[in-house]
């Protein structure tokens, strides 16, 4: 299935929020561990191995993920693109909430909620506004 040039909203409709969580988790674990297996994802997310198996198969079918003969998970170009967009939003909101005085654990949870709720346009404008404020200091 070829999905090039789709907008983020189209990705969201295709993989839903839980799929985004899995992609983001795989990206984070790849940065931390290098190679990632389903069991690593299950531990990190606190979900069952069968749940990860279902998600992995869905993401593989959608063209976001592959699994090699050693059962290591690899993001496709499209999967990496989605994961990096989600991760960028997550980091942005987590940092801003912590800077505003929110407890780091609460900031992490709230950032997850915000990153899905905000539109691409609103996120882009907000990020631009914050960057302009930072430059003015």
Placement of each model-derived feature along the sequence:
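N-terminal helix-turn-helix DNA-binding core of bacterial DNA-binding proteins
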Residues: 14-47
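DNA-binding alpha-helical recognition surfaces that contact promoter or target DNA
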Residues: 24, 54, 109
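Canonical helix-turn-helix DNA-binding module
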Residues: 38-69
């Amino acid at each position: 299935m070829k999905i090039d040039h789709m907008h983020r909203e189209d990705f969201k409709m295709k993989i839903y929020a839980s799929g985004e969580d899995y992609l983001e988790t795989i990206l984070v674990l790849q940065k931390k561990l290098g190679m990632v297996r389903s069991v690593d994802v299950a531990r990190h997310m606190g979900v069952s191995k069968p749940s990860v198996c279902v998600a992995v198969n869905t993401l593989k079918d959608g063209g976001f993920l592959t699994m090699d003969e050693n059962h290591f998970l690899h993001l496709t170009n499209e999967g990496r693109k989605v994961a990096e967009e989600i991760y960028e939003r997550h980091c942005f909101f987590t940092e801003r909430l912590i800077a505003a005085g929110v407890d780091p654990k609460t900031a992490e949870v709230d950032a997850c909620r915000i990153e899905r709720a905000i539109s691409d346009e609103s996120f882009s404008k907000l990020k631009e506004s914050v960057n302009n404020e930072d430059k003015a200091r």
